[in-house]
């Protein structure tokens, strides 16, 4: 009941509709004038069913013309035969909404014969995008048993695509592939699985640091404008990941920018004073780093070692328990790491990659250092 054909440049009328089969005529000793020598194509064989042609613009114009009669009169014509075969077929055609290549186009009379044109669009909400990724991602049962991906990780990955669609370095019309989040989610799970195998762990979860593994998925799924090419695909992808962390951080914890602002309060008609702000919930964390402490998180770090390292930071566990009192040990550890990346995204602490590890330090001390504050592409490539 279902037939499908990918429109490649080598598709012919014979493939779709049919042609005379000389071998069949010779074997059956039939004249070419006999209708029995006809070899029917995929469309007649899909009668009383659904037939789909994918990537319609790739179909040559002369082949598209051969579909006119089928769509309008509902019959087929093969060679010189006076053959009228009524067909009962539901035709479906697919094409990219933004065809920015020079491969061809849909001829106007054929487009006129297509009864309805449904225009697709990117998912309007994170929830819709999450459902699509969950449905399409190819995560094996063994991976699901070994690796747990929290809702936070899934939303961060989806947010990357939303950030890309509004990014100045990414082409606005067709710069973001619909497969970006699917490939990124699979890459994140694979990164966590690889780490678990290295340390012989029975199960693990996807950490924020594992999202460094989705950078190749992002660079291969976005089309950059000229300025983006100058910036570099890797830097743009890393910037998108950091922006998604920054955007999503305020959905889980207080906005650090709001805490920096001091509200003026009128004291009298002639005097104004600044209202004293309550101490920031991140004060203990930033003070710990200001005291000269630093935290190193290896990309291939064991879960147990990472949790121990996170608990060294003063106030980190406290802020997670304050806003997420119901979080279990695994969730709390992930949120603790998320807080560090979030504070780095809001420039309260610094974050940089050195030899396969993420180093968190105080911002002032890092500014005195001439090193970069971001992941280095060469460092990451060592861990592929």
Predicted features, each with a name:
Residues 1-42, 47-144, 187-199:
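Canonical AAA+ ATPase core
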Residues 14, 65, 151, 155, ...:
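Non-catalytic, well-ordered alpha-helical scaffold segments
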Residues 38, 89-93, 128, 132, ...:
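Charge-rich, low-complexity amphipathic helices
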Residues 41, 150, 207:
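Residue-level signal for threonine
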Residues 101-105, 111-174, 196-201, 226-231, ...:
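Conserved C-terminal "switch" segment of AAA+ ATPases
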Residues 136, 153-164, 177-199, 211-214, ...:
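AAA+ P-loop ATPase catalytic core
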Residues 173-179, 330:
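Structural motif
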Residues 193-384:
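C-terminal engagement/docking regions of AAA+ P-loop ATPases
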